Amino acid sequence: MRASRCCWETAPVHEARVSDGVSIAYETFGDPGDPPVLLVMGFGAQMIAWHEDFCAMLAGGGRYVIRYDNRDCGLSTRFHDHPVDMSRFIAAVSGGDIPAAQAMIPYSLRDMAGDGMGLLTALGIEKAHIVGSSMGGMIAQTMAITQPARVLTLTSMMSSTGEPDYGQAAPAAQQALFSPSPPDRQGYIDASEKELAWSSRRYANAGAIRELAARSYDRAYYPAGIGRQLGAMILAGSRADALKTLNVPTLVIHGLDDTLVDPSGGKRTAELIPGARLLLVPDMGHDRPRELWQDLCDAIEAHTRFA
């Protein structure tokens, strides 16, 4: 397998080689001597979706915060040589031909979890607190399942277990998620307002959505990776049995207004993981509005305080 890495960027970032052929772009906030917190972003989103002010707020609470681009996104390694025909992929999955579907996707959710662990290794960090959002929550769960000794605590935000009966999207949110965005900059920014379909209704902010879309487009527009990430997520299957045996202190955070991953996904996650605490946030959708940052940081800081 040959992968290629983006070689241009609009702002300096650090880069770490985490495995053969895969490099991960990352940024850090705070004092390296503080307890490390690894932030794992979701489907198709760059690390800047963890806003730098949010990261600084978390770091201000005495945490060494690390955010990074998942593979096939942002400034991390891109898998140009593996184009995916999503129609064929979906047909294979729907028809039960999982081996054929797997052959179309060059990596798995486990590989993506390995990237995060590899980044910690490259930074000389043996153990860390892991915080994952949406698909990032699935990746974070996988980190805790596959390498529990390296996970001090797990925080799974607006995510689910991979079971089909939990965490399903509302039809309008699902339609918005999979509606194609124009390839030109202005069209992409305008189309980003579709995210209002799953945003926190009370704090809905089209301006903030458009600002992130513009920054993401200018930093590293790369829609080709989305299909491969989606394939890895679909093929990951259920983590239910593994979560039942997890022995990692876990906090599950889910917005009660989430229409992209129904709150049943968070409730089910907390139900399965022994000793997990569940924080259901009123007025929060499938996003992290600035108005809730302090509450979210306080919850993460409290959860990571004693591990």
Where do the language-model regions lie?
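Conserved HGGG/HGGXW glycine-rich cap/lid loop of the alpha/beta-hydrolase fold
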Residues: 20-99
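Conserved acidic catalytic loop of the alpha/beta-hydrolase fold
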Residues: 98-99, 106, 110-128
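Short glycine-enriched nucleophile-adjacent loop
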Residues: 137-148, 154
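Flexible "cap/lid" loop of the alpha/beta hydrolase fold
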Residues: 145, 154-183
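Alpha/beta-hydrolase
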Residues: 169-241, 248, 268
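Short beta-strand/loop motif that positions the catalytic acidic residue
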Residues: 246, 252-254
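Acidic catalytic loop of the alpha/beta-hydrolase fold
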Residues: 257-261
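Catalytic active-site module of serine/aspartate enzymes centered on a nucleophile-bearing elbow/loop
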Residues: 276-307
